[in-house]
Amino acid sequence: LDAACPGDVFTSPTPDQIEAATKSVNGGAGILHIVKNYTGDVMNFEMAAELSRTEGIEIETVVINDDVAVKDSLYTAGRRGVGTTVLAEKICGAAAERGDDLKQIADLCRKVNEDGRSMGMALTSCTVPSAGIPTFEIDDAEMEIGIGIHGEPGRERMNLKTAGEIVEMMSQAVISDLPFRGGDEVIAMVNGMGGTPLMELYLVYGELDRICKKTGIRIARRLIGNYITSLEMAGFSITLLKVDAALLKLWDAPVRTPSLRWGV
């Protein structure tokens, strides 16, 4: 991953910003845009890609749409892009470092997207600075299942349950969607939404590990922490990515970033 291009809080970057980021890391071999499936992001990255192509930069775009919670939402047409984005960036970055060409890396990214599934939940909302009020209201004894990363409410509100019950419900939605089957190897990610203590995320992972073992799914690698957040929202998401030996080799390749660091 050579460049990240954020917009304002919960706002897509502009085409000019994306084009500037693209040009700043162009080494002549082409650029892969990895875009979460939100309407503004997709539209602006499409415009930026066209601008970059007029300047002779080869562009490939892969849209991540791994969220099983919704087919359509306020911010997206089709499934939202969430946790699989992190896994795709790491794996594709390793492929680029290895010397794969642009088409190979884009095809690899599409495979990761096809084989990854995610779902999130929240106990609290978040407050967008420009609004100054929570994006939705929720009682202490309630929870939202299927929330988004821009403070969107979930697809279902229900009474608060135990960690085991919550993870059981979410993991079954994730597992049944691909579907994952006994014997599959996966990378599992438990991602905090910004306001959940790390100790609780490890508790969630323990429940996910138990469920995967019961289902016959082998967790080959795991990632636990705050990677795609929604300001101060208390909650988490789970992501499963089906992998083979080739993908695991790319995942295990050395990485040194503020959030991921191993093999160096």
Description of each model-found segment:
Residues A4-V9, R53-G78, K214-I219:
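Short, acidic/small-residue loops that bind anionic groups at enzyme active sites
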Residues R98-L203:
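Mixed-charge interfacial surface used for oligomerization/domain docking
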Residues V42-G56, Y75, E200-G206:
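Short Gly/Thr/Asp-enriched flexible loops that form oxyanion-binding sites at enzyme active sites
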